[in-house]
Amino acid sequence: MSLVKVRIGDSIDKALRALKKRLDKEGVMKSVKAHRFYSKPSIKKRAKSKAALKYKKQR
């Protein structure tokens, strides 16, 4: 669980930015996006190999 301490006088925008930054760092949003819809194992496997090829081409 992510907690962001807000001091007296801090703006809500600053607190929201800090929360978003912490969630991105922990990978929460990425996992929510990945589990939003069911994807078949074959599609996961295909995406994984495609990412590996992309990474290999960069190196």
UniProtKB/Swiss-Prot annotation:
GO CC annotation terms, alphabetical: ribonucleoprotein complex; ribosome
Chain segments carrying region Disordered: 40-59
Signal peptide start-end: none
Keywords: Ribonucleoprotein, Ribosomal protein
Pfam families recorded: Ribosomal_S21
One GO term of the biological process aspect: translation
InterPro entries assigned to the protein according to its UniProt record, in alphabetical order: Ribosomal_bS21 (IPR001911), Ribosomal_bS21_CS (IPR018278), Ribosomal_bS21_sf (IPR038380)
PROSITE patterns linked to this entry: RIBOSOMAL_S21 (PS01181)
Family: Belongs to the bacterial ribosomal protein bS21 family.
Name of this protein: Small ribosomal subunit protein bS21
Organism: Protochlamydia amoebophila (strain UWE25)
